[in-house]
Amino acid sequence: MLSFLQNPRQAAAQVLNFALILSTAFMMWKGLSVASDSPSPIVVVLSGSMEPAFQRGDLLFLWNRNLLEETKVGEIVVYNVKGKDIPIVHRLVRKFGAGPKAKLLTKGDNNVADDTELYARGQDYIEREDIIGSVVGYIPFVGYVTILLSEHPWLKTVMLGMMGLVVVLQRE
């Protein structure tokens, strides 16, 4: 069962394989960030505020390279609110002015009111600099795993334990 302890070369190879997988995932994430010009090129929909367009758990792909083009009313954007860590996925419903200093108002498709209550205190609108990216594609329900892991922390422990067990018991 613990035969990997008897063969340090095999144990080192398994550790290096695991490190290779982690570094590859990190490089892919950073590559997507640079290509899309977005700090978070992939986000998960955390609430039902954008139904029926997007369901809770949908994985969204963002693009932020259209800096020369104006953000258009009707676009679905992901933006950060000053002082809050969770990005919000909502539709741009009104625009005041033009250019990088235009004032933007957003609203969830499934919400009755606009997002002024979600913005930071004293902030009535968001600006282009608050936008992380525009949604260019999605995969339904794939992000639900991250929601489950954040809502049920014990699942992280179970999952990490199972992954560790697989690494320990794996034979080459």
From Swiss-Prot:
Protein topology in the membrane: Single-pass type II membrane protein
GO molecular function: peptidase activity; serine-type endopeptidase activity
Cytoplasmic topological intervals: 1-14
Segments traversing the membrane: 15-35
Any one biological process term the GO annotation gives: protein targeting to ER
Major subcellular location class: endoplasmic reticulum
Residues the record marks as active site: S49 (charge relay system), H90 (charge relay system), D115 (charge relay system)
PROSITE patterns: SPASE_I_1
Enzyme class (EC, first level): hydrolase
Reaction equations catalysed: Cleavage of hydrophobic, N-terminal signal or leader sequences from secreted and periplasmic proteins
Entry's EC annotation: 3.4.21.89
UniProt remark on domains: The C-terminal short (CTS) helix is essential for catalytic activity. It may be accommodated as a transmembrane helix in the thinned membrane environment of the complex, similarly to the signal peptide in the complex substrates.
Protein family according to the UniProt entry: Belongs to the peptidase S26B family.
NCBIfam families, sorted: sigpep_I_arch (TIGR02228)
Subunit relationships: Component of the signal peptidase complex (SPC) composed of a catalytic subunit SEC11 and three accessory subunits SPC1, SPC2 and SPC3. The complex induces a local thinning of the ER membrane which is used to measure the length of the signal peptide (SP) h-region of protein substrates. This ensures the selectivity of the complex towards h-regions shorter than 18-20 amino acids. SPC associates with the translocon complex.
Protein's name according to its UniProt entry: Signal peptidase complex catalytic subunit sec11
Originating species: Sclerotinia sclerotiorum (strain ATCC 18683 / 1980 / Ss-1)
Recorded name of the encoding gene: sec11
